[in-house]
Amino acid sequence: MADVSVDQSKLPGVKEVCRDFAVLEDHTLAHSLQEQEIEHHLASNIQRNRLVQHDLQVAKQLQEEDLKAQAQLQKRYKALEQHDCEIAQEIQEKLTIEAERRRIQEKKDEDIARLLQEKELQEEKKRKKHTPEFSGGSASGDNYYYEDGGMKSRGINEAVSAPARVSHRDQEWYDAEIARKLQEEELLATHMDIRAAQVAQDEEIARLLMAEEKKAYKKAKDREKSSLDKRKHDYDCKSKAKSAHSKSKEGDETQRAKIDRPSRPPPPAAMAPEDVDPTHFTNQHSNTRHFSKSESSHKGFHNKQ
């Protein structure tokens, strides 16, 4: 095999070749680090966007739950108001019926009193009519008494029995009036007791409903607060985990870059151009990395100039 002749005057120096190799290696490492940084930035942006979307969904869900709770409260308020209106209307109807019944009873009592008064006037007129007859009869009765030896006359008996009958009728009417008034007072007291009990029951129902609504509202607020705290805690944990992961990833990448980076060969001792072995230089150059021979020669020639 014929020996290949190499023009030693066009070959670059060893230091220049090592420097060019180091520059190329630095460029490669910088490009790799830049790509890793871009990938990390894109990954962090994707994670941040996902977290924002999750937070928006949670906030929307909480808002919907709050709106539902408010709608339920308004519905309960309306139902309670309607119930109160129905109770008030029922009480008003009862009061109206009671007032009408009382008015009718008063009218009946007035009619009865008027009739009794008319009867009393008629009885009074009858008594006035019987009074002269009683006077005339007393004289004849006296004569009859003295003649018959102590027998009572018929006029005296009628005069004594007529006031007794009138007095007995007045007593019955007075007793009936007292009984009616007592019955009215008893009915009124019973109605007042029923109304007071109904009002107390309505107040108790309203108080219980208000307490239940306050409890439900407080429970909804506590649930919303706990959800917000949990979301904030999850966000902090994710942020801490993300920062720790990024730091560990950067440390691993830096360590890997340091491990993967080959050590630079020590600069060779200065030799005379005539002592340079072309075969030794060719072997060393092929062991490190295969560069373009024409490019290296061109760079070395340019540096010499």
Curated annotation (Swiss-Prot):
Region (Disordered): 122-143, 218-305
Entry-annotated residues carrying N-acetylalanine: A2
UniProt entry tagged with the keyword Coiled coil: yes
GO molecular function, one term: ubiquitin protein ligase binding
Modified sites of kind Phosphoserine: S5
Coiled-coil segments on the chain, per record: 86-130
Entry-linked Pfam families: CCDC50_N
Coiled coil found in the keyword field: yes
Assembly mode: Interacts with RNF126.
Protein name (Swiss-Prot/TrEMBL): Coiled-coil domain-containing protein 50
Taxonomic placement: Eukaryota, Metazoa, Chordata, Craniata, Vertebrata
Gene field: Ccdc50
